[in-house]
UniProtKB/Swiss-Prot annotation:
<feature type="glycosylation site" description="N-linked (GlcNAc...) asparagine; by host">
    <location>
        <position position="371"/>
    </location>
</feature>
<feature type="disulfide bond">
    <location>
        <begin position="229"/>
        <end position="258"/>
    </location>
</feature>
<comment type="similarity">
    <text>Belongs to the HIV-1 env protein family.</text>
</comment>
<keyword id="KW-1015">Disulfide bond</keyword>
<feature type="short sequence motif" description="YXXL motif; contains endocytosis signal">
    <location>
        <begin position="724"/>
        <end position="727"/>
    </location>
</feature>
<keyword id="KW-0472">Membrane</keyword>
<feature type="glycosylation site" description="N-linked (GlcNAc...) asparagine; by host">
    <location>
        <position position="300"/>
    </location>
</feature>
<keyword id="KW-0175">Coiled coil</keyword>
<dbReference type="InterPro" id="IPR000777">
    <property type="entry name" value="HIV1_Gp120"/>
</dbReference>
<keyword id="KW-1032">Host cell membrane</keyword>
<dbReference type="GO" id="GO:0075512">
    <property type="term" value="P:clathrin-dependent endocytosis of virus by host cell"/>
</dbReference>
<keyword id="KW-0564">Palmitate</keyword>
<dbReference type="GO" id="GO:0020002">
    <property type="term" value="C:host cell plasma membrane"/>
</dbReference>
<feature type="glycosylation site" description="N-linked (GlcNAc...) asparagine; by host">
    <location>
        <position position="473"/>
    </location>
</feature>
<dbReference type="GO" id="GO:0019062">
    <property type="term" value="P:virion attachment to host cell"/>
</dbReference>
<feature type="region of interest" description="V2">
    <location>
        <begin position="163"/>
        <end position="207"/>
    </location>
</feature>
<keyword id="KW-0812">Transmembrane</keyword>
Length: 868
């Protein structure tokens, strides 16, 4: 029996040992598998966005005396050392045809033109009948002038008309007769038969369709470079691929704060003073197969175009009423000559050849034909632009009148409608003073006449082309100059940029967990409070309201931001009174956006308990359903952008869990701080605490009585099972003896029993003492046994661990010695082989050397044999 008990005890010891080891391994594995959400602030993550851009411009780039229509004096100064950071191993998608920067620049230019013309004079009183005749001046050309000047004089005749009309003076009921010179394109006949050549009655061309506003006297239309900049929290991504076609992925990406200087040149057909391609000519279109889409051509070498208005004009003032002055052309000094532009024929032909080469690559090696515009408004049919304040409309037929094809031997075959004459292409130009404003329908502008001669020089850096439709089987593709939509002009410069919003907050799994006060209670009512307004919790209790502080703080911030937006809208609505330009509004918006982005990020960090931290651990366990990748795959093989796309659908959920965890932590800390009342012993004797003392005493007494009853019942049940019948709690209960302990006799024989009969204790204090003693002894024995088992396990694990370490140390020493011996042996063998090889090489060299030395001797011996 004893042997059996000993065997059972031994088996139990093995079971305890293996069970404890398995439990430890399970705990280690479970601890290793636990991952926790960690917050990172400042991660390089961005997302496509649209935001308000503000402008920067060089303060010295414009004349301080004249007000340029672009209002660059309201822009911030440019950064003398702009920073551009190249993003290594980054591929980003760009789309120049769906770029909000283009729309924003278009709206800005419209607003600038509107604001520039708002205070200027309306020319409604000029919508009267004009009696006009062709303007002729005395021809003072002498015989020494060049023949080409005479030709231009003949072309210039009939371009201007001398008109007289009645106008109201400062006194309303008084009319006076005035005269003025108008360009032929600015007036139209009002006779019934407009095709006759002897019409004398005319009117301004836009009187029946548009409201004409005269440009203010000191407004300059000279384009000034404008840099578009992003506010803090946003950035510009720039594509640096030299052959980027405007859409698709770009592998050479950098980030900048501002664009390069973009000149807002309003022109058609030809793009002037823009940026050039770095290598070969680049063509861009939203869809090359759709002939309705404009093709933007970017040249790699600019072509200079020089334009002139030879006439020496004077300016005349006509008073239209109180405070309203109309400026018109007074007279022309000298000969009337037509305005014109000159382009080098060789440069232009070389440019067309490069464009044709690029177009042939795109459209299947067909013949590339350039033809004149197919018709439309004068702005579309002719190359229109501003030169020195005057608006030129130049006939570009001579530029687009050729067909280009490659012959079988690889040379270019060029067919022209007109033969080339001279080294210079001269484009005849006409000037208009009443301009259809390209940005607004139903409004026109009267450009003031410019005194003196006008000359301007520009660089052609691109073209706007349209392709004629037709079948796929045709052998010739016809391209015509286009334009008119100024968005294409801005798009030709903004194609390489896109606006992104920086997302500095990132979450990722790590093994680090925030140490928190452990109290597994959830914040009751938190989810319901999410739907309450900022003031919706005013009627709730203070406890319920305190659970929704996060929601209220968020709504408070959004209220501040909304208020700022309302103020901005009010300022924008009253900018004509405040004299704010569109750039001033944008700067205010940019500053508000920067503050808003910063406050939002700091607000989230504050909600999560991460204020002022770049890396912040949390108590939120990582859910494998968000991403089941391992830590090595995440941290060693993925960028922050890839990781953000991986968990983008769960980011809001993770943020919510972090907020709930932080709220629970703060509630637990609050309850823990309430326990500090026990540190104040002076309040223990307070009369208000007596009821608590009595309640605690009653609970202790009740617990002891209940415990005593339980023990008594268990004792009775145990003795009943052994055959005793307890008649009373005062019955003496004999303690059983063992089989080897005989009872005593009357003669005193035998051993005196040390264990006599005992009776149940009686009395309240005796019962309490006996029960407490039994409970303490039981707890002591169990704890002692547990500590012995733990100590034995620790001792065993320590001994086994030490043996394993010694084994690995001996194994390491053994293999180190083996590697050392192998290395020494390898070095010895190598040295022997090298020595033997060296000896052989030396021996061969010596033999060759001796052979060379013996050559004279062998020759002498040969001669001796020959003589013998």
């Amino acid at each position: 029996m004893a042997m059996r008990a000993k065997g059972i005890r031994k088996n139990c010891q093995h079971l305890w040992r293996w069970g404890t080891m398995l439990l430890g391994m399970l705990m280690i594995c479970s601890a290793a598998a636990n991952l926790w959400v960690t917050v990172y602030y400042g991660v390089p993550v961005w997302k496509e966005a649209t935001t308000t851009l503000f402008c920067a411009s060089d303060a010295k780039a414009y004349d301080t005396e004249a007000h340029n229509v672009w209002a660059t004096h309201a822009c911030v100064p440019t950064n003398p050392n702009p920073q551009e950071v190249v993003l290594e191993n980054v591929t980003e998608n760009f789309n120049m045809w769906k770029n909000n920067m283009v729309e924003q620049m278009h709206e800005d230019i419209i607003s600038l033109w509107d604001q520039s013309l708002k205070p200027c004079v309306k020319l409604t009183p000029l919508c009267v009948t004009l009696n006009c005749t062709d303007l002729n001046t005395n021809n003072t050309t002498n015989t020494t002038e060049l023949s080409i000047i005479v030709v231009w004089e003949q072309r210039g005749k009939g371009e201007m008309r001398n008109c007289s009309f009645n106008i109201t003076t400062s006194i309303r009921d008084k009319v006076q007769r005035e005269y003025a010179l108008f360009y032929k394109l600015d007036v139209e006949p009002i006779d019934d038969n407009k095709n006759t050549t002897n019409n004398t009655k005319y009117r301004l061309i836009n009187c029946n369709t548009s409201v004409i506003t005269q440009a203010c006297p000191k407004v300059s239309f000279e384009p000034i470079p404008i840099h578009y900049c992003t506010p803090t929290g946003f950035a510009l991504l720039k594509c640096n691929d030299k052959k980027f076609n405007g859409t698709g992925p770009c592998t050479n990406v950098s980030t900048v704060q501002c664009t390069h200087g973009i000149r807002p040149v309003v022109s058609t057909q030809l793009l002037l003073n823009g940026s050039l391609a770095e290598e070969e000519v680049v063509i861009r279109s939203e869809n090359f197969t759709n002939n309705a889409k404009t093709i933007i051509v970017q040249l790699n070498v600019s072509v200079e175009i020089n334009c002139t208005r030879p006439n020496n004009h004077t300016r005349k003032r006509v008073t239209l009423g109180p405070g309203r002055v109309w400026y018109t052309t007074g007279e022309i000094l000298g000969n009337i000559r037509q305005a014109h532009c000159n382009i080098s024929r060789a440069q232009w032909n070389n440019t067309l050849q490069q464009i044709a080469t690029t177009l042939r690559e795109q459209f299947g090696n067909k013949t590339i034909a350039f033809n004149q515009s197919s018709g439309g408004d004068p702005e579309i049919v002719m190359h229109s632009f501003n030169c020195g304040g005057e608006f030129f409309y130049c006939n570009s037929t001579q530029l687009f009148n050729s067909a280009w094809n490659v012959t079988s031997n690889g040379t270019w075959s060029v067919t022209r409608k007109q033969k080339d004459t001279g080294d210079i292409i001269t484009l005849p130009c006409r000037i208009k003073q009443i301009i259809n404003r390209w940005q607004v329908v139903g409004k026109a502008m009267y450009a003031l006449p410019i005194k003196g001669l006008i000359r301007c020089s520009s660089n052609i850096t691109g073209l706007l082309l349209t392709r004629d439709g037709g079948g796929e089987n045709q052998t010739t593709e016809i391209f015509r100059p286009g334009g008119g939509d100024m968005r294409d002009n801005w798009r030709s410069e903004l194609y390489k940029y896109k606006v992104v919003k920086i997302e500095p907050l990132g979450v990722a799994p790590t093994k680090a967990k925030r140490r928190v006060v452990q109290r597994e209670k959830r914040a009751v009512g938190m989810l319901g409070a999410m739907f309450l307004g900022f003031l919706g919790a005013a009627g709730s209790t203070m406890g319920a309201t305190s659970m929704a502080l996060t929601v209220q703080a968020r709504q408070l911030l959004s209220g501040i931001v909304q208020q700022q937006n309302n103020l901005l809208r009010a300022i924008k609505a009253q900018q004509h009174l405040l004299q704010l330009t569109v750039w001033g509004i944008k700067q205010l918006q940019a500053r508000i956006l920067a503050v808003e982005r910063y406050l939002k990020d700091q607000q989230l960090l504050g909600f999560w308990g991460c204020s002022g931290k770049l890396i912040c651990t949390t108590a939120v366990p990582w859910n494998a359903s968000w991403s089941n990748k391992t830590l090595d795959q995440i941290w060693n093989n993925m960028t922050w952008m890839e990781w953000d796309r991986e968990i983008d659908n769960y980011t809001h959920l993770i943020y919510t869990l972090i907020e709930e965890s932080q709220n629970q932590q703060e509630k637990n800390q609050q309850e823990l701080l309430q326990l500090d009342k026990w540190a104040s012993l002076w309040t223990w004797s307070d009369i208000t605490k007596w009821l608590w003392y009595i309640k605690i005493f009653i609970m202790i007494v009740g617990g002891l009585i209940g415990l005593r009853i339980v023990f008594a019942v268990l004792s009775i049940v145990n003795r009943v099972r052994q055959g005793y019948s307890p008649l009373s709690f005062q019955t003496l209960l004999p303690n059983p003896r063992g089989p080897d302990r005989p009872e005593g006799t009357e003669e005193g024989g035998g051993e005196r029993g040390r264990d006599g009969s005992t009776r149940l204790v009686h009395g309240f204090l005796a019962l309490v003492w006996d029960d407490l003693r039994s409970l303490c002894l039981f707890s002591y024995h169990r704890l002692r046994d547990l500590l012995l088992i733990v100590a034995r396990i620790v001792e065993l694990l320590g001994r086994r661990g030490w043996e394993v370490l010694k084994y690995w140390w001996n194994l390491l020493q053994y293999w180190s010695q083996e590697l050392k011996n192998s290395a020494v042996s390898l070095v010895n063998v190598t040295a022997i082989a090298v020595a033997e090889g060296t000896d052989r090489v030396i021996e061969v060299v010596q033999r060759i050397y001796r052979a060379f030395l013996h050559i004279p001797r062998r020759i002498r011996q040969g001669f001796e044999r020959a003589l013998l």
